[in-house]
């Protein structure tokens, strides 16, 4: 992971110290090379790389698929409940360092069940770490994601296996999502499984409009009936869609450094986040797969502020959006926004 140097501008320092929420993080994508090697040794898993440096050197992605290939290889070291605990606690430490006070975390059960690891094992390890995080002042939710390159039948089977867990962990496991290879796998492919999730009262999110066209965002909204759109940066190509997103306040969980690393944009100065913000869309800033993409939440904020020349009011709005778009109770949302306001406007609103 590359480290972003905190510049000495007042806005950068204010942003780093601000309480914030993360709404787009794949827990398997927080698995740093050092922990991959430690878990491989603990579990007797043979890796294709002979050193941590060799693994880092393989992080030269050209697109989403080339990243996913190595992402799934890295996840192969996760076998036992303790492995999922250790991975999640490492992410929690990063959150605490970045003043992330609330996180809504994705996990990919099919990545593990196809290796014989039950979903219950995955969730038990993650939940134990998140319960420990609560004792340190960080709240969280968990969202089960279906892999879109697999069939809807596979997603339906995964949903049924997970069904008891939605009850057992109803305080934490509050929704479903859709991720993995976007091209050729439109949201419409998963209409039935999202309808089942909706019938249980679960929250719904989906990756759309990262590499896929704006039509995928329409499908996520109209067919899957999502509460939030993950990525969504290609919505800018359709003015009517941008207006709809702005009017409905359906948030986009944008991941700037991920978009740069996966060549969605060839330069961060060309990112659409500010254009969307200017048009009233509820954009947020997130890390996606931080171990692979070179930065956790603060690194994403700092790079985006620098590249897009964001001002104080714009950064405040983005951070506030992260709380507004979260799946917390209205009471907790008000408390989180009050903490942000106390930090951002210490003398009260100006």
Swiss-Prot record:
Keywords: Hydrolase, Metal-binding, Nucleotide metabolism, Zinc. Coiled coil: none annotated. GO terms for cellular component: cytosol. Binds 1 zinc ion per subunit. GO terms for molecular function: adenine deaminase activity; zinc ion binding. SUPFAM superfamilies: Metallo-dependent hydrolases. Its EC number is 3.5.4.2. The active site is at 210 (proton donor). PANTHER family: ADENINE DEAMINASE. Catalyzes the hydrolytic deamination of adenine to hypoxanthine. Plays an important role in the purine salvage pathway and in nitrogen catabolism. Belongs to the metallo-dependent hydrolases superfamily. Adenosine and AMP deaminases family. Adenine deaminase type 2 subfamily. This is Adenine deaminase. It comes from Paraburkholderia xenovorans (strain LB400). The lineage of its organism: Bacteria, Pseudomonadati, Pseudomonadota, Betaproteobacteria, Burkholderiales.
């Amino acid at each position: 992971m590359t480290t972003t140097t905190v510049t000495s501008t007042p806005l950068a320092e204010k942003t780093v110290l601000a309480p914030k929420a993360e709404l787009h993080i794949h827990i398997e994508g927080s698995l740093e090379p050092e922990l991959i090697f430690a878990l491989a040794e603990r579990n007797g898993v043979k890796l294709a790389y002979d050193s941590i440096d060799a693994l880092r050197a393989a992080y030269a992605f050209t697109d989403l698929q080339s990243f996913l290939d190595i992402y799934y290889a890295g996840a192969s070291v996760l076998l036992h409940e303790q492995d999922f605990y250790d991975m999640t606690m490492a992410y929690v430490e990063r959150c605490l360092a970045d003043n992330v006070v609330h996180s809504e975390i994705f996990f990919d059960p099919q990545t593990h069940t196809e290796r014989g690891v039950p979903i219950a094992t995955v969730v038990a390890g993650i939940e134990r770490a998140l319960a420990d995080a609560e004792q340190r002042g960080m709240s969280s939710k968990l969202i089960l994601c279906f892999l879109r390159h697999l069939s809807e039948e596979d997603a339906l089977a995964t949903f049924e296996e997970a069904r008891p867990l939605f009850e057992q962990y109803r305080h934490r496991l509050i929704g479903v999502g859709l991720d993995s290879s976007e091209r050729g796998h439109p949201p419409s492919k998963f209409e039935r499984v999202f309808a089942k999730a909706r019938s249980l009262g679960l929250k719904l999110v989906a990756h759309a409009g990262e590499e896929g066209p704006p039509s995928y965002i329409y499908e996520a909204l109209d067919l899957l009936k999502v509460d939030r759109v993950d990525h969504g940066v290609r919505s800018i190509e359709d003015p009517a869609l941008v207006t709809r997103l702005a009017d409905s306040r359906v948030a986009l969980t944008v991941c700037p450094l991920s978009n740069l690393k996966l060549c969605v944009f060839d330069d961060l100065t060309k990112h659409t986040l500010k254009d969307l913000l200017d048009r009233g869309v509820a954009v947020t800033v997130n890390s996606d797969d931080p171990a692979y993409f070179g930065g956790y939440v603060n690194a994403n904020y700092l790079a985006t502020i620098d590249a897009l020349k964001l001002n104080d009011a714009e950064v405040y709005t983005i951070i506030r959006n992260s709380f507004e778009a979260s799946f917390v109770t209205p009471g907790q949302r008000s408390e989180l926004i009050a903490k942000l306001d106390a930090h951002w406007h210490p003398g009260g609103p100006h």
